[in-house]
């Protein structure tokens, strides 16, 4: 019986140029939530008999997102199965918007009213949801996943794009 899920996720540390405490917290939460509950089935690997769980490494190479998928052998490693490459051009606007809204959100938490924070958070969720839908479209035919997993993956894609 297969177990089509991510059991381990890694971000290419060389890709991450800058972090702050707020973004680091977002990263930790996204990884924790992703490992706790996700649906992730790389179609080529699954059809070849590799039914999960999977290890996933996210990196940016030549301006493109690389999702490197390996079997999880239970010992911290596994066989490389495939690397799915996605162009990031369509994600630039949502990433930029997400960062701008997150910046406003983090500032608002410190000094705004509950209503103002809620308004900013709704905008943040809207951009996040739109980007997750876009990611689902881009993964179609390559990796089967669900909306919640795509949402958390988008958070991690954003972490890879932080510039100080």
Curated annotation (Swiss-Prot):
It holds the Pfam family UPF0262. Transmembrane segments: none annotated. It comes from the Bacteria. HAMAP family: UPF0262. Belongs to the UPF0262 family. This is UPF0262 protein Saro_0143. It comes from Novosphingobium aromaticivorans (strain ATCC 700278 / DSM 12444 / CCUG 56034 / CIP 105152 / NBRC 16084 / F199).
């Amino acid at each position: 019986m297969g177990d089509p899920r991510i059991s381990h996720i890694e971000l290419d540390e060389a890709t991450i140029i800058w972090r702050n405490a707020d973004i680091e917290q977002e990263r930790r939460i996204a990884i924790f939530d992703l490992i706790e509950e996700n649906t992730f089935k790389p179609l080529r690997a699954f059809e070849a008999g590799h039914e999960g769980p999977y290890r996933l490494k996210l990196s940016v190479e030549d301006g493109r997102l690389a999702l490197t998928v390996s079997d999880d052998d239970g010992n911290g490693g596994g066989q490389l199965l495939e690397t799915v490459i996605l162009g990031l051009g369509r994600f630039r606007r949502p990433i930029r918007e997400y960062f701008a809204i997150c910046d406003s959100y983090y500032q608002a938490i410190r000094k705004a009213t509950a209503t103002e924070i809620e308004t900013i958070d709704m905008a943040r969720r809207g951009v996040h949801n739109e980007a997750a839908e876009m990611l689902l479209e881009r993964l179609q035919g390559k990796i089967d996943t669900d909306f919640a997993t795509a949402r958390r993956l988008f958070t991690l894609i954003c972490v890879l794009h932080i510039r100080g």
